[in-house]
Curated annotation (Swiss-Prot):
InterPro entries documented for this protein: ENTH_VHS, HGS/VPS27, HRS_helical, UIM_dom, VHS_dom, Znf_FYVE, Znf_FYVE-rel, Znf_FYVE_PHD
Modified positions (Phosphotyrosine) in chain numbering: Y216, Y308, Y329, Y334
Organism the protein comes from: Homo sapiens
Protein name: Hepatocyte growth factor-regulated tyrosine kinase substrate
Membrane topology reported for the UniProt record: Peripheral membrane protein
Domain notes for this protein: Has a double-sided UIM that can bind 2 ubiquitin molecules, one on each side of the helix. The FYVE-type zinc finger domain mediates interactions with phosphatidylinositol 3-phosphate in membranes of early endosomes and penetrates bilayers. The FYVE domain insertion into PtdIns(3)P-enriched membranes is substantially increased in acidic conditions.
N6-acetyllysine: modified positions: K207
Annotated region described as Interaction with NF2, given as residue ranges: 480-777
Region (Interaction with SNAP25 and TRAK2) residue spans: 445-543
Length: 777
């Protein structure tokens, strides 16, 4: 940071204050001096200025850019290295994109353009030139460039040189001889050769620092030269014809000496008159410019044309080489006449009001009252510009405008310049100023113009205050507009948040409604599921009830006593894969299939089934007395059709399917009644050869007559099968479709030949044969 960091920060805050109305050059120059003399490091200073440049307030940013411009122009290479790099250029480009203030944007463009022109011959600062070219390609409009803006006075203190001996006396450095550096030339010296201290203005070092003796002498010689140069003639005198005259005093003869004596006498007289006039002037000054009044009265001064219009006095000593312009100032009679007229004219003690005073708009400033004071009579009075309006050209009481003001200032400047030149000329020639009437007359003329000059200064101060007030009002308006813009932005933000909140509430309500509808849907689905479960339970209950009823029916059948069943109506049918009964009922009831669990044969059905029915079929009815005891054993487990003869157990069904195997219950005592009866012989039906496979056989439906049975003769109808019985007839022509088991080999089913083609291998059965019974159970 450096030793002067606190001072630097204070000066930087002062130079970039937002309360400034114009640039504070004094603080900026002090900042430059701190950096140049090394009290503040260049890197720290540039970083601090960058922070001010990035400030939100555009006034602070603009003043910070002014500080950066001055630092770059006055502080040399150390600052150039910190500013003319890629990081700083990128920061300025970003600031240009973000900044909306026109003045700040123009200042950034102006600085980049000036730096690009100043560093165009420096290869290490080429990034500035590249940035300038890129911004031109991007379309940025740079302000008008003046080459004088890129003139940098970059003188800085030289770098210190390191060595082992003194640069002047060549003494080796050691423990007792320390190294010292001269701040002016940068060389290394011993303590004796660098014992002087001096300021170095060209490097901005205003405090006394250690320098070597040659540099000290050089700096002091320059200081003495500057002190003597203050007495040199100004450029106005050097360009005038008076400067071309010979400055050596001419050779004096007797005539010249006499003229000199007369001149001295005239000067003495003029001095006495001047003293008297000085007393009168002081009195008039006290009355015309009271200390309590802020606006002093103005006095009219003779214009430049009136000073040169009088004829030249022939008695005045003039040489041929004297300028005629100077001769006019040496006209004593003219100035004496002017003094007499000034004494006769009264001096007003009160200000003279104007007929139409100029109104001062705004700020409550009152227009100053113009007072005409004529210490020297003249034909034309000089204008006194009042403070006019801000949008119109200021008018004076005599109708003259700013041009008269400029003429007055030009005449005053010429009078002062001539007065100074005359004083210097007298000094160089060794003349006494008190004896020079031209100097006295010029002094009186300038003294008469002085009050009017003060009046003009007061008016300018009032106008400055007025415009400063306008600038304050503009700043207030700008701040008010900024506050209004902020309020509008805040209002828009509030509306946007309210809209977002309303949208969020609407989304929440929609989500709640959707959740309620989902819950209702879930409840509806749950109710439907419960109803479906309830229906399934009811169906299951009904099925269980039916199963219970069937079980009860089966139990009732098992518990009912057996009744004798006449077998005369039964027709023996062969079992082909199952047992099928073809009852011979009434014509209105065709033969049906009775599965397991059927209710046929129950007492309820026995009422109808017990009615006699005509026998249907080609075979006669079987007498009930021809029962054979061995027929009881021919009971097939599945309900199906029976044949005329009972087949042996090996021929009852195919062995491929155990589900169709014949069930052979043990004969009981209940079947003895049936066995005691003699069965009726049936016609012999040839039995076809047994096939290893069972197939589906379709033919014409044949009604077979049988005696209906009931629960009482159920047990008696169950046949018993014996090994001595003939084999069961497997097929009868004209029977309903039968189901036979398919062969495992997948071959086509073998169809039984019709009855007409079957050989009559068997004759009618014997008297002792038993008829085969069919079970519907």
């Amino acid at each position: 940071m450096g030793r002067g960091s606190g001072t630097f920060e204070r000066l930087l805050d002062k130079a970039t204050s937002q309360l400034l109305l114009e640039t504070d050059w004094e603080s900026i120059l002090q900042i430059c001096d701190l950096i140049r003399q090394g009290d503040t490091q260049a890197k720290y200073a540039v970083n601090s200025i960058k922070k001010k440049v990035n400030d939100k307030n555009p006034h602070v940013a603009l003043y910070a850019l002014e500080v950066m411009e001055s630092v770059v122009k006055n502080c040399g290479q150390t600052v150039h290295d910190e500013v003319a790099n890629k990081q700083t250029m990128e920061e300025l480009k970003d600031l240009l994109k973000r900044q909306v203030e026109v003045n700040v944007r123009n200042k950034i463009l102006y600085l980049i353009q000036a730096w690009a022109h100043a560093f165009r011959n420096e290869p290490k600062y080429k990034v500035v030139q590249d940035t300038y070219q890129i911004m031109k390609v991007e379309g940025h409009v740079f302000p008008e460039f003046k080459e004088s803006d890129a003139m940098f006075a970059a003188e800085r203190a030289p770098d210190w040189v390191d060595a082992e001996e003194c640069h002047r006396c060549r003494v080796q450095f050691g423990v007792m001889t320390r190294k010292h550096h001269c701040r002016a030339c940068g060389q290394i010296f011993c303590g004796k050769c660098s014992s002087k201290y001096s300021t170095i203005p060209k490097f901005g070092i205003e405090k006394e620092v250690r320098v070597c003796e040659p540099c000290y002498e050089q700096l002091n010689r320059k200081a003495e030269g500057k002190a003597t140069s203050t007495t040199e003639l100004p450029p106005e005198y050097l360009t005038s014809p008076l400067s071309q005259q010979s400055q050596l005093p001419p050779k004096r003869d007797e005539t010249a000496l006499q003229e000199e004596e007369e001149l001295q006498l005239a000067l003495a007289l003029s001095q006495s008159e001047a003293e008297e006039k000085e007393r009168l002037r002081q009195k008039s000054t006290y009355t015309s410019y009271p200390k309590a009044e802020p606006m002093p009265s103005a006095s009219s001064a003779p214009p430049a044309s009136s000073l040169y219009s009088s004829p030249v006095n022939s008695s005045a000593p003039l040489a041929e080489d004297i300028d005629p312009e100077l001769a006019r100032y040496l006209n004593r009679n003219y100035w004496e006449k002017k003094q007499e007229e000034a004494r006769k004219s009264p001096t007003p003690s009160a200000p003279v009001p104007l007929t139409e005073p100029a109104a001062q708009p705004g700020e409550g400033h009152a227009a100053p009252t113009n007072v005409v004071e004529n210490p020297l009579p003249e034909t034309d009075s000089q204008p006194i510009p009042p403070s006019g309006g801000p949008f119109s050209e200021p008018q004076f009481h005599n109708g003259e405008s700013e041009e008269s003001h400029e003429q007055f200032l030009k005449a005053l400047q010429n009078a002062v310049t001539t007065f100074v030149n005359r004083m210097k000329s007298n000094h160089m020639r060794g003349r006494s100023i008190t004896n020079d009437s031209a100097v006295l007359s010029l002094f009186q003329s300038i003294n008469g113009m002085h009050p009017q000059l003060l009046e003009l200064l007061n008016q300018l101060d009032e106008r400055r205050l007025y415009y400063e007030g306008l600038q304050d009002k503009l700043a207030q308006i700008r701040d008010a507009r900024g506050a209004l813009s902020a309020l509008r932005e805040e209002h828009r933000e509030k509306l946007r948040r309210a809209a977002e909140e309303a949208e969020r509430q609407r989304q929440i309500q929609l989500a709640q409604k959707l959740e309620i509808m989902r819950q209702k849907k879930q409840e509806y689905l749950e109710v439907q599921r419960q109803l479906a479960i309830q229906r399934l339970q009811e169906q299951e209950k009904e099925r269980q009830m039916r199963l219970e009823q069937q079980k009860q029916t089966v139990q009732m059948r098992a518990q009912m006593p057996a009744f004798p069943l006449p077998y005369a109506q039964l027709q023996a049918m062969p079992a082909a894969g199952g047992v099928l009964y073809q009852p011979s009922g009434p014509a209105s009831f065709p033969s049906t299939f009775s599965p397991a669990g059927s209710v046929e044969g129950s007492p309820m059905h026995g009422v109808y089934m017990s009615q006699p029915a005509p026998a249907a079929g080609p075979y006669p009815s079987m007498p009930s007395t021809a029962a054979d005891p061995s027929m009881v054993s021919a009971y097939m487990y599945p309900a199906g059709a029976t044949g005329a003869q009972a087949a042996p157990q090996a021929q009852a069904g195919p062995t491929a399917s155990p589900a169709y195997s014949s069930y052979q219950p043990t004969p009981t005592a209940g079947y003895q009644n049936v066995a005691s009866q003699a069965p009726q012989s049936l016609p012999a039906i040839s039995q076809p050869p047994q096939s290893s496979t069972m197939g589906y056989m379709g033919s014409q439906s044949v009604s077979m007559g049988y005696q209906p049975y009931n629960m009482q003769n159920l047990m008696t109808t169950l046949p018993s099968q014996d090994a001595s019985l003939p084999p069961q007839q497997p097929y009868i022509a004209g029977q309903q479709p039968m189901y036979q088991q398919m062969a495992p080999s997948g071959g086509p089913p073998q169809q039984q030949p019709p009855v007409a083609q079957q050989p009559q291998a068997q004759g009618p059965p014997a008297q002792g044969s038993e008829a085969q019974l069919i079970s519907f159970d």
